[in-house]
């Protein structure tokens, strides 16, 4: 590979002294609310992005002021599990140190803060550290937050799967001490020439972000096939014995560039549970060594597998682990939604899944959600589990405490509102006004849009049936829109590409149906399609499957060839 061809980020990483850069100097500079251009890339590895309020951008420009810079900080919480004590600390930070005064639950089972001024970053990170929470590797060219099915019913199997998710998260952490030095005031370590600081990542880390998930069938709430690397649990009775390993998924693409495409992961085969970390490290180091470092748009693992071929990639995994894949075991991949309301686990404790619209934990008029969760955390003795559908589970509630928890939830608007199957299965990214990449609205607009879709479902007599609908402000795919039965991807303000045809279970991608259309056109298209669906559907046929069977869109079987074709 010619050095001149490397992406700019590769030089930044090489010259950063293992992710230190000049972040400390930027932190000490009060004349601007921003970091330098290079450090804006490095701070991602520390868990946050620089943003500005796009609603105020033009106004501030007219006033000859710099943009209203702030930061989005994302925590690393493997499997989305935290204690009530941790939640109270998370809540206090949101209320006292961010301008958004809210907590945003993400599509990868963690939380993030928006509207953090630069001067508050260090305080927030130190406050999180006191509660054994951090933001290391929550962003950047590293392994991101590891997802795991929260599975509030099969609690024994969940605990086993969660243990592996936690190990994967801990083992794939960067080894650099930059985070501790800059944010936690640890003494700077002096490394000697040739010392191996990052035994897995190396000096330039990965070519691009890397996402892992652990699924516990039949649930596929973690959308395992959309991840770079996924482990599908195989159980014998209540015991986890191994995983079907999948690799090569990813949602991001670029409008108008057919060389980029979303992709679902390939099935590689079955591995024993005790070999999980070996296989994860093998896949990650192959991506480190083989991944594209010249063009970041083509640097995710999915492109590496397409370029080198499935068999070649599989052979390299087996060579690096010294272990052959066994044939994949039969498992059933089912629903991607959450189980709302109360469910009793095998340990006789109860688990309450609460719907959080758009993942935004905030005190809304008539719905003081943030206060409600705070009050629950003060009395709850179990744990809080964030889901990949942006919801939260109050887990491990003894029967004696059930009425207390439910009363608090109802009192604060966390329970009592009717949630349709479609709304309960649907998610959106943050988008405007904070995300720099957003081309259109998502979180702020999505609830009202869903209400109009629900009205169409009611008109056609199938409101009781769920459709997976997802909306993002751009094609980077944070809310996994290309794996939705109805995917809406922002193209311009008020305009979206409409994608149809993904499977309800998340095992097939969707395909572009209409491009760059406004709400009225979207709803008109769905109105007509819903009428056909009700008239022509087969018994038990989901909307996504109908659109493929009836020829509304072609099935995407090989994303590299079919997604744009």
UniProtKB/Swiss-Prot annotation:
Q: Which gene encodes it?
A: cysI
SUPFAM superfamilies in UniProt: Nitrite and sulphite reductase 4Fe-4S domain-like, Nitrite/Sulfite reductase N-terminal domain-like
Which amino acid positions bind siroheme, per UniProt? 478
Instruction: Cite a single GO BP annotation.
Output: cysteine biosynthetic process
Query: If you read the UniProt record, what top EC class would you report for this enzyme, in one word?
Result: oxidoreductase
PANTHER family, alphabetically? SULFITE REDUCTASE [NADPH] SUBUNIT BETA, SULFITE REDUCTASE [NADPH] SUBUNIT BETA-RELATED
Q: What does this protein do?
A: Component of the sulfite reductase complex that catalyzes the 6-electron reduction of sulfite to sulfide. This is one of several activities required for the biosynthesis of L-cysteine from sulfate.
* Name used for this protein in its record: Sulfite reductase [NADPH] hemoprotein beta-component
Coiled coil regions, renumbered to chain? none
Q: Name one GO molecular function term.
A: metal ion binding
Pathways per UniProt = Sulfur metabolism; hydrogen sulfide biosynthesis; hydrogen sulfide from sulfite (NADPH route): step 1/1
Binding partners and assembly: Alpha(8)-beta(8). The alpha component is a flavoprotein, the beta component is a hemoprotein.
Q: Which organism is it from?
A: Shewanella pealeana (strain ATCC 700345 / ANG-SQ1)
Any idea which UniProt keywords this protein has?
Answer: 4Fe-4S, Amino-acid biosynthesis, Cysteine biosynthesis, Heme, Iron, Iron-sulfur, Metal-binding, NADP, Oxidoreductase
**Source taxonomy:** Bacteria, Pseudomonadati, Pseudomonadota, Gammaproteobacteria, Alteromonadales
Q: Which InterPro entries match?
A: CysI, NiRdtase/SiRdtase_haem-b_fer, Nit/Sulf_reduc_fer-like_dom_sf, NO2/SO3_Rdtase_4Fe4S_dom, NO2/SO3_Rdtase_4Fe4S_prot, NO2/SO3_Rdtase_4Fe4S_sf, NO2/SO3_Rdtase_FeS/sirohaem_BS
**PROSITE patterns from the UniProt entry:** NIR_SIR
